[in-house]
Amino acid sequence: MVVGMFMAILDIQIVSSSISEIQAGLAASPDEISWVQTAYLIAEVVMIPLSGFLSRLLSTRILYVISAASFTLASLACAVAWNIESMIVFRALQGFLGGAMIPTVFAASFILFPPERRAGISVLIGLVATMAPTIGPTLGGYLTQAFSWHWLFLINLVPGVLVTTGVWFLVKFDKPNLELLKGFDFAGLALMALFLGSLEYVFEEGPRWDWFEDQSIFTFAVIGTLAGLGFFARVLSARNPIVDLRAFADRNFSLGCMFSLIIGVGLYGAVYIVPLFLARVRGLNSLQIGEIMFVTGVFQFISAPLAGMLSKKLDLRLMLGIGLVAFGTGVYLMTWITADWSFWELFWPQAIRGMSLMLLFLPINTLALGTLPPDKIKNASGLYNLMRNMGGAFGLAGINTVMIDRAALHGSRIAEHVTLTNPQVQATVDNFSQMFTAAGLGNPDLAAVKMLDNMVLKQAQVLTFADCFLLMALLFYAGLLLMPLLRAPKPAPGSGGGGGH
């Protein structure tokens, strides 16, 4: 089951480093190709909270088998997509059909295993949940360069078949409850899909189109707001709501969801912004970027057994606090970034961030879900995982907005001091001009000015990246303010593991 979850999370990021190759292969425009990522995220974010209801209706085994088998078929369809329209449809199906695997694994770990065994299981699940987005760009870049972009999807076929078969024969610990179909809340489902889908679209596309200045962003924001109001009114009044929000009455679960949102910002934000810096400022290719990003994954592996041991010796709240400080410090060190930073300058910030992720995931999983009774865990797991995904969407939207606004600000401020009336600037331009003249280039003076403009642009980008890292660090440090509100976890009655597989 964990392997299936790994595939579903991996496919969020695996295409990110190979978008240009997919665009060329499908003859897509820049606006169209962005939907390869957006369609997957919108569809997945709708399925994640729905998975709690479906697992109670169908049983964990049947839901997971349907999800894994359908995800595998959708992956094959993506690999043979004949144009951009078919790729977008298949990616949406892949995200929706595979989305159930993620919360189902989280829920099963708390239902199947007693409290004394959950630390080791949480380490494994946390490692998979954080490793997948970390190595996604690395693996994607390698597959595309070594073979072709089609292998970004074909790689899912063999594991998908094995996972589907294994779960069908080995996982048996609950039964379907088809009585839930009576009075099924179709209106609630439609409102939830509109609410979450519109919200994800606004977050994903808003920064690129200047938010509400764009008519489609404004329209979806209005639709999402109205659908959200209708959805919450529906789930609070329906006899059998599509999503049960009563788990939020548990203080630890509510706080755990807030921490999950914060982790989503950091996890997906860092995986997005570091490769962006290496591509835009350093000019590295996808494989070189992947090698640098792999440092984080290595230290996640190293820290996994350490996190498991610490969870047995430390108060989980203290462990969470250490993780927040460590992650915040890892990204704060990136605020000193320059245009010359590469592997070794990024090594320790990446290493600290990688180690901190395991110190965050294990205690948050236990604090959020460990005190809930078994009958609430399936539904709560969907909500908990939804918050991490929404944190990622919120974080990327914030990063892209800051990148646009702060780059313009830094660029204008630098330009105020970089004028040809400045003797040092004039001397630099003269040196560039002489260099281009010696190289035999036409119009060396114009080329020299353009080179100076590029230097200003690059420095503005570096300062903007530093601003993003600072905001991310402050968010994790601010998370410490929530720590006193957490209660020490005490297993709920009947929360011990049971069943077999």
Q: What do the predicted segments below correspond to?
A:
Residues 18, 32, 162, 389-488, ...:
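Hydrophobic transmembrane architecture of multi-pass small-molecule transporters
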Residues 76-80, 164-169, 229-233, 332-335, ...:
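Membrane-embedded alpha-helical segments of multi-pass transporters/permeases
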Residues 124-128, 259, 383-387:
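Hydrophobic alpha-helical segments of secondary membrane carriers
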Residues 157-199, 210-211, 216-219, 242-249, ...:
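Central mid-sequence intracellular linker of multi-pass
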Residues 1-52, 56-59, 64, 75, ...:
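Transmembrane core module of solute transporters
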Residues 153-168, 192-195, 220-224, 467-484:
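Symmetry-related core transmembrane helices of the 12-TM Major Facilitator Superfamily/SLC fold
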Residues 17, 48-189, 205:
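Helix-loop-helix hairpins in multi-pass membrane proteins, especially solute transporters
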Residues 131-137, 141, 346-430, 484:
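Small-residue-rich alpha-helical segments with characteristic i,i+4
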